């Protein structure tokens, strides 16, 4: 879970008593009046497609990971589960890495080149292709990268991949993207509208940019229809209200009391 303070600053970790750091919990958030992120809110809603994918990966791992001599059922099951999670963990790390490079690119900083060779070449292809598809579909924009915010009145926050006065953009990195394969799902629009309205309450055009990690330079732009923005917003605010009921925590009330 990700959290933000009332100034929009990320509060993903908190100091431990021994001086180290640990992930912020709901209990910590209650104490400080921190708000949940858009993605944390949307996690309260089931994702059937994702669950099917996880089950399929577990089945594949069960067929691949052989039971060792003398290994108990529980030990074997743990290895199968770890194997099934490995691919998604690697994909998540790669996605974070690409997001970080895109942030530098749109902030006009130098592309990170700690890993030289093919990696740097691939990253440049991804960044250039992303910029090109945005130029074609959005025109010239004053892009702002990785902006965090807090909507004090509704009690949620988040960090936006890219936005301007007219647009809110969220990047989605995938192993491969095929032109005829469905990439965009309504849950992505629910996430985007939370970002869009969370900035200052104004409506913006919303789009996902799907980025291929296996074929650097292949990107697909998907805009969400403007006539459905209000429907997406109703879904998001319903999820937000459900989250507050389930967690028995309304940060906007905490922060109003403290003001």
Regions found by a protein language model. Give the residues of each.
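Metal-dependent nuclease catalytic cores that hydrolyze phosphodiester bonds in DNA/RNA
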Residues: 1-156
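Mg2+/Mn2+-dependent nuclease catalytic core
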Residues: 143-252
């Amino acid at each position: 879970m990700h959290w933000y303070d009332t100034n929009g600053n990320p509060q993903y970790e908190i100091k431990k008593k021994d001086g180290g750091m640990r992930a912020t919990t709901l209990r910590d958030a209650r104490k400080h009046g921190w708000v949940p992120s858009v993605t944390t809110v949307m996690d309260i809603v089931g994702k059937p497609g994702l669950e099917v994918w996880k089950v399929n990966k577990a089945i594949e791992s069960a067929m691949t990971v052989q039971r060792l001599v003398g290994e108990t059922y529980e030990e074997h099951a743990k290895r199968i589960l770890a194997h099934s999670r490995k691919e998604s963990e690697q994909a998540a790390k790669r996605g974070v890495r690409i997001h970080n490079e895109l942030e530098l690119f749109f902030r006009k900083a130098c592309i990170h080149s700690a890993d030289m060779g093919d990696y740097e070449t691939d990253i440049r292809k991804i960044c250039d292709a992303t910029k090109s598809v945005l130029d074609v579909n959005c025109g010239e924009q004053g892009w702002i990268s990785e902006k965090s915010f807090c909507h004090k009145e509704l009690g949620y926050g988040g960090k936006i991949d890219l936005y301007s006065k007219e647009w809110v953009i969220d990047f989605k990195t995938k192993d491969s993207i095929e032109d005829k394969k469905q990439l965009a799902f309504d849950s992505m629009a629910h996430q985007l509208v939370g970002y869009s309205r969370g900035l200052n309450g104004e409506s913006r055009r919303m789009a996902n940019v799907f980025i291929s990690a296996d074929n650097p330079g292949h990107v697909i732009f998907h805009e969400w229809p403007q006539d459905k923005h209000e429907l997406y917003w109703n879904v998001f605010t319903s999820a937000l209200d459900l989250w507050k009921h389930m967690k028995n925590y309304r940060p906007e009330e905490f922060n109003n009391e403290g003001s």
